[in-house]
């Protein structure tokens, strides 16, 4: 997870250098998709952990 944070930090820096042009919109779109993917994965992880403890 830390790897993805570092990747998006680098993408954000590149987008800032290029003046928040097309790369920023693309990175924001990817970030939105990955946010929901990781949200679902986190919920599945919490649910599976709760079910294993029972």
Curated annotation (Swiss-Prot):
Keywords: Cell membrane, Membrane, Transmembrane, Transmembrane helix. GO terms for cellular component: plasma membrane. InterPro entries: DUF1328. Its main location: membrane. Disulfide bonds: none annotated. It holds the Pfam family DUF1328. Coiled coil: none annotated. It is a multi-pass membrane protein. The chain crosses the membrane at residues 5-25, 27-47. The keyword Signal does not apply. It is found in: Cell membrane. The keyword Zinc does not apply. It comes from the Bacteria. Belongs to the UPF0391 family. This is UPF0391 membrane protein BAV1230. It comes from Bordetella avium (strain 197N).
